[in-house]
C-alpha cells in the first residue's frame, strides 16, 4: 500500500476521533460506553512503524487480533484483561465519549486501547489499539515495533 494512503488513513482516524460524539447524535452510545463493564474488541488493520535507515516509515497490513476487557470500573479507574501473557497493570479513563484502557507491563511496553462512542455498524463501536514496544530483532508473531490497529468493539455487559 503506498505511503500516501497510510498517511491519509492516519489523518482520517485523527479527524474522526476529534469530533464530539454528542454533536453527531450519539449521546446514547456515549452513555452505554460510560456504563460498560465488559468490552470485546476485534482489530483488522495494522499500521507498523519502524525506522528504515533512521528514517521513520510505516506499513499497513491486514490483521486479526482480539482484546477483551472485563470488570471495567470507571469510577476506580480499573479493569482486567483476558491475556495469555499474564496480568498487567491496567488504568481506565472515560472522558467525553472516549474510553481509554491503558496497559503497562513491568517489562516496559505500553498498550493503549481507545473505544469511541461512535457507531461502526451492527452494535459495534470504533476502536484503536496501539502497542508501544521496540526490539532490535523482528520476531514473527510478536510485537517488535510500534503498532496501531483499527477495528471495532462491542459492549458485552453481563446481563
Predicted regions: what they are:
Residues 126-133:
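Internal, hydrophobic beta-strand segments that form the core of beta-sheet-rich folds
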Residues 76-111:
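Contiguous, well-ordered beta-strand patches that form the walls/edges
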Residues 18, 22-25:
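Boundary at the C-terminal end of the N-terminal hydrophobic targeting segment
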Residues 30, 35-80, 109-114:
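Short, solvent-exposed loop/hinge segments that bridge or flank secondary-structure elements
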Residues 135-159:
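Edge beta-strand at a domain terminus
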Amino acid at each position: 500500500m503506498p505511503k500516501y494512503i497510510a498517511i491519509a488513513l492516519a489523518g482520517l482516524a485523527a479527524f474522526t476521533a476529534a469530533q464530539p460524539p454528542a454533536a453527531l447524535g450519539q449521546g446514547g452510545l456515549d452513555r452505554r460506553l460510560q456504563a460498560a463493564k465488559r468490552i470485546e474488541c476485534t482489530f483488522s488493520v495494522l499500521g507498523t512503524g519502524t525506522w528504515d535507515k533512521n528514517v521513520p516509515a510505516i506499513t499497513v497490513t491486514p490483521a486479526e487480533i482480539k482484546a477483551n476487557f472485563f470488570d471495567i470500573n470507571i469510577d476506580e479507574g480499573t479493569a482486567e484483561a483476558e491475556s495469555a501473557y499474564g496480568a498487567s497493570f491496567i488504568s481506565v479513563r472515560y472522558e467525553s465519549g472516549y474510553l481509554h484502557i491503558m496497559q503497562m507491563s513491568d517489562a516496559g511496553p505500553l498498550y493503549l486501547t481507545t473505544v469511541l462512542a461512535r457507531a461502526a455498524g451492527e452494535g459495534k463501536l470504533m476502536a484503536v489499539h496501539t502497542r508501544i514496544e521496540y526490539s532490535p530483532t523482528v520476531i514473527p508473531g510478536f510485537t517488535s515495533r510500534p503498532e496501531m490497529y483499527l477495528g471495532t468493539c462491542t459492549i458485552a455487559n453481563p446481563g
